[in-house]
Amino acid sequence: GFAILGFGAIICQKNQANLYGDSVKLLDFGVITTPAKTPLEQRLCTLYDDLHTVIKQFQPDLVAIEKFFFYRMSNTILVAQARGIILLVLGQHDLPIVEFAPSQIKLTLAGYGKAEKSEVQEAVARELDLDYVPRPDDAADALAIALTAWFQS
């Protein structure tokens, strides 16, 4: 959504000599929040500034995002505006982007494209060797997208 943007940073290493030597490690996860009662332009500025900070902190080689679908929802325009800010910041850092549909993420992590959110979250915890499901949901979703990019590479 627009009020909360989840992020998840992982380190992925492919071992060319050993098919089973690939590894993935959690760096961090969290959310960027923009309070609902704040004027739109300030919310977009917060998103812009905070996303720059996250990118500078983790210096990613690749960014994976969820594909945006237009629903008949009143917040579609707001989400599209936030997405524009996200793409702008990623472009300013010259970062390659991969996008995945929700069904691709579910299929990759849970084994089928209509999996429940809880099944995907449990898969995230398992793949990252965590004894807990990352919270909030937006951060767990971001980690699911990051893992999907890793598995699809």
How should each PLM-predicted stretch be described?
Residues 2-153:
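Phosphate- and other anionic-substrate recognition elements at nucleic-acid/protein interfaces
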